[in-house]
Amino acid sequence: MHRYRSHTCGALRESNIGETIRLSGWVHRVRDHGGVLFIDLRDHYGLTQCVVDPDSPAFSLAEKLRSEFVIKMDGKVRRRPEGTDNDDLPTGKIEIYVSEIEVLGPAGDLPLPVFGDQEYPEDIRLKYRFLDLRREKLHQNIMTRVEIIKSMRRRMEGQGFFEFNTPILTASSPEGARDFLVPSRIHPGKFYALPQAPQQYKQLLMMSGFDRYFQIAPCFRDEDPRADRLPGEFYQLDVEMSFVTQEDVFAAMEPVITGVFEEFAKGKPVSKNWRRIPFAEALRKYGSDKPDLRNPIEMQEVSEHFRGSGFKVFARMLEDPKNQVWAIPAPGGGSRAFCDRMNSWAQGEGQPGLGYIMWREGGEGAGPLANNIGPERTAAIRAQIGVKEGDAAFFVAGDPDKFWKFSGLARNKVGEELNLTDKERFELAWIVDFPMYEYNEDDKKVDFSHNPFSMPQGGLEALKGQDPLTIKAFQYDITCNGYEIASGGIRNHVPEAMVKAFEIAGYGEQEVVDRFGGMYRAFQYGAPPHGGMAAGVDRIVMLLCGTTNLREISLFPMNQQAMDLLMGAPSEATTKQLRELHVRVNLPQK
C-alpha cells in the first residue's frame, strides 16, 4: 500500500465496502458520541467520515486529535448504519472503521477556524491565507478559477489562436498608470518596468507574422487602492489578431466569452445576442460606460418640458445651452415614501436632492415639480418616458458631463430599490465608438481617453482635419452586469498616423521614437492591420463565483493598502542590496 494513501477523501463509495484502505488529510472536526469518536477527514477532493471506538488500538491517539492536524489513517470501509447517510457528501453512504492513526503534522491553536462560515477580519484572513484557503467556499472559488482559465485556453485554441508568453521585465510605457520599476544592477541608473499589459509585445507578434496570439497574462500597475481592482497585479486573457476589422474581433471573441459564461453560470441565462451600444448612448441612457443591462430603466432627456416652465431652478439652468434635464423613470415607485427615500439618498451622495413627479390615478402628476410646471407639461413628460399610474420619475439637471455618473448611480439605486434588476442572469454587451481623446482638466491639455495605440475612425485624415475631441476610435469594451470585463481596439499600424495621434496628446515625434522604439521601428518594415482585446480574468471569475470581492477569487492577494500580510511585502532592502543596485532611498519627510 502507498506510504500515505490508497484513496483520496472523496473517492470511496459503497463499491469499496469491505476493503482495507489508507487515507491522509486534515482533521476537519472531531465529534464524541457516547465515547465513540467520529473524525471527518478532509483533503482537496472531499471528506470522509472515520469512526474510532474504544476497542480500536488507535483510540488513545484519536482522543488527542484537534482540528487541522494532518494525519494518516488505516481502516476498513463499511456501510453507515441505517438512517445516518449524508446525501450531501459523495462519500455519505460509507464510513471508515479506523485501526491505525499516524500524526503527520500537528496543528497549533487556530487564528481562524476552517470549519464553518464565520466571518473574520480580512487582515487576519490574509495573514493566515493558507488556513483561509482550506475553507470550503474559498477553496471552491479558486478551483472554479482554474477551470475557467482551462476553458478559456481550450476555446481560444479552438478558434485558431496560439499561446505565447511575453517578457515580464520590459521598458516603461504610458499605459495610464504608474509602473512598478525594477532597478538594473548591470546598468546602473537604469530601470526595467513590470508590464502594465503586454500591449506592445502582442502587436510586435503580429508584425512578426504569427497572426493569432493569446495568453493568460499577468499585469502590474502601481495604482492607488480601488474597491473594484486588486492592488499590484491582475490577470487578463490577452488577445491579438492580424488582418482583421472590428467585426472580426467581435466574431472571434463573442463565442469564447459567451461559452465561458454558459459553462459556469450554474443555469443562469446568458445573453446570446450581444447588444452594441455607442459610448455616448451608454452615458445618455444608462449614466455609465459599463451599464448594468439587467436593469430595464433607460433615462431620457426631457429638457424641452422644463424650458420656460414654472420650475425656475431648471428653467434658469436651461438658459445655458450646454445644460440639460434627464428623467429617470421609476416603474412602481410612485409613493411619497419612496421618493423621499431617494431624495435622502441623493443628499447622502453630496447632491442637493432629486426632483420627482409621481403619477396618481387617472394619470395626474403629483409632487412639487408637477405643481410648478402644470398638468400639460407633466402629461407630456409621462407620454415621452412611457410611465403609467403608480410610477414616478426622478430628474437630474445641469451639465451632463458633470452629472452623468450620478444619474447612473441613481438609475442603479432605483433598479435595486424597486427590484427591477434581475440578479439571476448575465447580460453581456459591447460598448463601441469611444472618444479617441478627452480634455484633461488637471493638466489643461488634450489627452488619450483610453488606449493610445487605437486606430482613429477616419484614420490620418481625421487626425489632421477634425477637432480632436470629436474623433472616435475603433475601440470597444465588453460589459457584464455593471462591470467592464474586457477592453480592446483596432490598432494604429500606420507610422505617420501613430506619430500624429501622439502629437495631438502632446508627445513629440522623438519622444514617440524614444519610448516606443521597438514598435515604431517595426512599423517601418511592413505592419499588418491588426486588433485585439484583453478580458479581465479576475472580474470574470468574480462574477461567475457570485461574489463582489476580488480577494475571494485570488490565491494570495494584497490588502487594500497594497501589503502582502502573509509574506511581509513590501519590505526594506538591505544596505548590501541597495549598494549593488546603486540605489539610495530618499524617504519623504514626516
Curated annotation (Swiss-Prot):
Organism domain of life: Bacteria
Cellular component, GO, one term: cytoplasm
Pfam family, one: GAD
Chain residue ranges for the region called Aspartate: 199-202
Subunit structure: Homodimer.
Key word Aminoacyl-tRNA synthetase present: yes
InterPro entries named in the record: Aa-tRNA-synt_II, aa-tRNA-synth_II, aa-tRNA-synth_II/BPL/LPL, Asp-tRNA-ligase_1, Asp-tRNA-ligase_1_N, Asp/Asn-tRNA-synth_IIb, AspRS_core, GAD-like_sf
Transmembrane segments: none
Enzyme class, broadest EC rank: ligase
Sequence similarity: Belongs to the class-II aminoacyl-tRNA synthetase family. Type 1 subfamily.
Function according to Swiss-Prot or TrEMBL: Aspartyl-tRNA synthetase with relaxed tRNA specificity since it is able to aspartylate not only its cognate tRNA(Asp) but also tRNA(Asn). Reaction proceeds in two steps: L-aspartate is first activated by ATP to form Asp-AMP and then transferred to the acceptor end of tRNA(Asp/Asn).
Protein name: Aspartate--tRNA(Asp/Asn) ligase
Xref: Gene3D superfamilies: Bira Bifunctional Protein, Domain 2, GAD-like domain, Nucleic acid-binding proteins
Amino-acid positions noted as binding ATP in the UniProt annotation, renumbered to this chain: 221-223, 484, 536-539
Residues binding L-aspartate: 175, 221, 450, 491
